[in-house]
């Protein structure tokens, strides 16, 4: 399966059978190279990936400044140290799951809930990790 198929079929999927889906998603290498993304995923800046990777290594690094992605600032909320970063902005937010080689991004807006975004992103992230990726 291509990386784009993982994004299209596992991240941009119908979450609840009602046609709801994430606003944007991507699979990105630890070096910031985009493996696949939805058409709506923002353009990443190298320093944003550097900051995200540092927060996985040093949990709490992004808390004072916020998480920036494509120039959008998210307030960092409770995640899982070294494994998941979660952010909030207004009625939407972001979940980032780290695997051995990749970062799985999901961005949501209402009516999708934080829990639904977490489930979609972390399920694919866990699967990729189990595959050694």
Curated annotation (Swiss-Prot):
Quaternary structure annotation from Swiss-Prot or TrEMBL: Occurs in many kinds of cells as a complex with monomeric actin in a 1:1 ratio.
Cysteine disulfide links: 13-117
Function comment: Binds to actin and affects the structure of the cytoskeleton. At high concentrations, profilin prevents the polymerization of actin, whereas it enhances it at low concentrations.
Classification via Gene3D superfamilies: Dynein light chain 2a, cytoplasmic
Location in or out of the cell: Cytoplasm, Cytoskeleton
Modified residues (Phosphothreonine): 113
Similarity remark: Belongs to the profilin family.
Motif (Involved in PIP2 interaction): 83-99
Name of protein: Profilin-2
């Amino acid at each position: 399966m291509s990386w784009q198929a993982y994004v299209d079929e596992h991240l941009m999927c119908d979450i609840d059978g009602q046609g709801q889906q994430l606003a944007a998603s991507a699979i990105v290498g630890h070096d910031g190279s985009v493996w696949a993304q939805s058409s709506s995923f923002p353009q990443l800046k190298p320093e944003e990936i550097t900051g995200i990777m540092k927060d996985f290594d040093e949990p709490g690094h992004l808390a004072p400044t916020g998480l920036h992605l494509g120039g959008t600032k998210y307030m960092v909320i409770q995640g899982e140290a070294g494994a998941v970063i979660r952010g909030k902005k207004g009625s939407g937010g972001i979940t980032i799951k780290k695997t051995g080689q990749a970062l799985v991004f999901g961005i949501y807006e209402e009516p999708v809930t934080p829990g639904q975004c977490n489930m979609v992103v972390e399920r694919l992230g866990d699967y990729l990790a189990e595959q050694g990726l």
